[in-house]
C-alpha cells in the first residue's frame, strides 16, 4: 500500500531514504504474512489470476491458497487505481499557475499503519506544506515520523525568490541522537540574520494573522546562536500532524549539534 505515495514524496531527498527503508520493511512483513497460507505465491499463480494445484496439498489447502491470492490481487488492483488517481491529481495541480501577486497554500500528507500479533504498531507519517505570498515570499514545512526506526525529523524553509534559509532538525527516539542543520541557498551563512529579518519584514506587509506565514515559534535548543534564535521564531504553536501523535513532539532537546552549509543554485 505504501506505493500510493506520490512522486513528490518519493523524489524529495528529505523523505526518500526513510521511504525506501519503510517500503522494504513492508515487503518483508507481507512476505512473512503470506507464508502460512500459500508459501511462494509466485509459484502458485501463473500471473493471470489462475492458481495451479500442487501435490501434497488437499482440497482445503488449495481453496485457502486460491482465496488468499485472489484477495491480494484485489488489494493490489485497488492500490494501483488509487495511485493512478493521485498521480493524475498531482499533474492537474502542477498545471495550475501560481499568481506571483497572490497568496496560496498547498499541503500533502500520507500515513501507513501496520500491526502483527502482539508487536507494537508500526506507524509512518509524512507531510509537506508550502505557503506563498506576493514578492517571491515562500515558506516550506516538511515533517516525517517513523515509529519503526524511531526517527522523527522536520524542516522549515524561508524563501525570497531564489534565496533561501532552511533549518532541519531530527531526533531518533531509540538511539537518542539529535541534530540541527542549516542550509543556505544562494547566500552565505553570515547573511542569514539579515535574510531572516528581510523575510519577516516582507511578511509583515500583509498584516499577519494567526494563520499567516510568520506565525512561527521554535522551542529553545540550548544554544543562543543565530540558528537557535531563528528556530525559536519559526516553530508553529499547533501540533504538526506528521510528527505529533496525540502529544507535542519532543524532537528538540537541550543538547543538539548545529551544522550549516551553503548551496549555490544553478538558476540564472
From Swiss-Prot:
UniProt GO cellular component terms: ciliary basal body; cilium; cytoplasm; nucleus
Biased composition (Basic and acidic residues): 226-237, 244-257
Coiled coil: none
Annotated Pfam families: Mlf1IP (PF10248)
InterPro entries xref list: Myeloid_leukemia_factor (IPR019376)
Keyword Transport listed: no
An MF annotation (GO) of this entry: DNA binding
Keywords of this entry: Cell cycle, Cell projection, Cytoplasm, Cytoskeleton, Developmental protein, Differentiation, DNA-binding, Nucleus, Phosphoprotein
Region feature Interaction with COPS3, mapped onto this chain: 50-125
Region annotation (Disordered) ranges: 208-268
UniProt modified residues of type Phosphoserine: 6, 8, 32
Principal subcellular localization: cytoplasm
Top-level taxon in the UniProt lineage: Eukaryota
Compartments in which it is found: Cytoplasm; Nucleus; Cell projection, Cilium; Cytoplasm, Cytoskeleton, Cilium basal body
GO BP term (any one): myeloid progenitor cell differentiation
Post-translational modification: Phosphorylation is required for binding to YWHAZ.
Function: Involved in lineage commitment of primary hemopoietic progenitors by restricting erythroid formation and enhancing myeloid formation. Interferes with erythropoietin-induced erythroid terminal differentiation by preventing cells from exiting the cell cycle through suppression of CDKN1B/p27Kip1 levels. Suppresses COP1 activity via CSN3 which activates p53 and induces cell cycle arrest. Binds DNA and affects the expression of a number of genes so may function as a transcription factor in the nucleus.
Family label: Belongs to the MLF family.
Subunit structure: Interacts with CENPU. Also interacts with NRBP1/MADM, YWHAZ/14-3-3-zeta and HNRPUL2/MANP. NRBP1 recruits a serine kinase which phosphorylates both itself and MLF1. Phosphorylated MLF1 then binds to YWHAZ and is retained in the cytoplasm. Retained in the nucleus by binding to HNRPUL2. Binds to COPS3/CSN3 which is required for suppression of COP1 and activation of p53.
Protein name according to UniProt: Myeloid leukemia factor 1
Origin species: Pongo abelii (Sumatran orangutan)
Amino acid at each position: 500500500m505504501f506505493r500510493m505515495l506520490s512522486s513528490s514524496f518519493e523524489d524529495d531527498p528529505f523523505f526518500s531514504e526513510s521511504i525506501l527503508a519503510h517500503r522494504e520493511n513492508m515487503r518483508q512483513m507481507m512476505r512473512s504474512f503470506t507464508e502460512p497460507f500459500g508459501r511462494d505465491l509466485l509459484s502458485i499463480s501463473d500471473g493471470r489470476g489462475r492458481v495451479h494445484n500442487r501435490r501434497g496439498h488437499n482440497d482445503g489447502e488449495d481453496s485457502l491458497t486460491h482465496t488468499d491470492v485472489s484477495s491480494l490481487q484485489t488489494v493490489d488492483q485497488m492500490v494501483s487505481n488509487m495511485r493512478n488517481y493521485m498521480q493524475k491529481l498531482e499533474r492537474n495541480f502542477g498545471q495550475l499557475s501560481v499568481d506571483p501577486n497572490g497568496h496560496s497554500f498547498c499541503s500533502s500528507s500520507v500515513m501507513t499503519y501496520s500491526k502483527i500479533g502482539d508487536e507494537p504498531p508500526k506507524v509512518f507519517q509524512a507531510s509537506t506544506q508550502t505557503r506563498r505570498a506576493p514578492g517571491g515570499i515562500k515558506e516550506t514545512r516538511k515533517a516525517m515520523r517513523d515509529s519503526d526506526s524511531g526517527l522523527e525529523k522536520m524542516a522549515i524553509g524561508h524563501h525570497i525568490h531564489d534565496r533561501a534559509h532552511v533549518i532541519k532538525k531530527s531526533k531518533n527516539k531509540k538511539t537518542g541522537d539529535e541534530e540541527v542543520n542549516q542550509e543556505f541557498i544562494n547566500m552565505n551563512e553570515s547573511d542569514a540574520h539579515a535574510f531572516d529579518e528581510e523575510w519577516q519584514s516582507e511578511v509583515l506587509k500583509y498584516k499577519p494573522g494567526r494563520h499567516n506565514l510568520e506565525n512561527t515559534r521554535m522551542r529553545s535548543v540550548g544554544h543562543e546562536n543565530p540558528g537557535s534564535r531563528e528556530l525559536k521564531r519559526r516553530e508553529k504553536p499547533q501540533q504538526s500532524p506528521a510528527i505529533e501523535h496525540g502529544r507535542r513532539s519532543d524532537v528538540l532537546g537541550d543538547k543538539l549539534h548545529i551544522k550549516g552549509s551553503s548551496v549555490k543554485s544553478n538558476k540564472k
